[in-house]
Amino acid sequence: MIGLLIITHETIGEAYRGLADHFFPNGFPENLHILGVQPDEDQNDIINNAIAALQEFPDNRGVLIMTDIFGATPCNAARRLVRENKSAILIGLNAPMMIKAIQYSSQAENLSDFTETVKEAAIRGIFAITSAPEDLVCKEHG
């Protein structure tokens, strides 16, 4: 099992908890912890809180840390927690990333492979639609 730690600005992570509840109605996964960073929070306090969260995970195959914005405080704190084969980071948290991570973390055995799989899900979940589909027809209600 791979542990999952989400470190985001304020309540963004909690919004993702709600999304997880929607997709996984049998309960919030035990291997997922969320840490919300406050605007005035000290960097060392953030790191200490993250270390405490990491220590709550059972002896497992590593922890994937997901953060929201590259270069921002949550990301900078998380970068200090990376340890080869023990923890990795994905930055740019989105819904497909989180759903894939939750869906497969319990059976994942290799942190590096798992991280790449989750990253690919995040990338494949992004689309740009710049024009209306040609077959879109609105029906009149009558």
Regions found by a protein language model. Name each.
Residues 2-64, 70-142:
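N-terminal loops that bind phosphate or other acidic moieties
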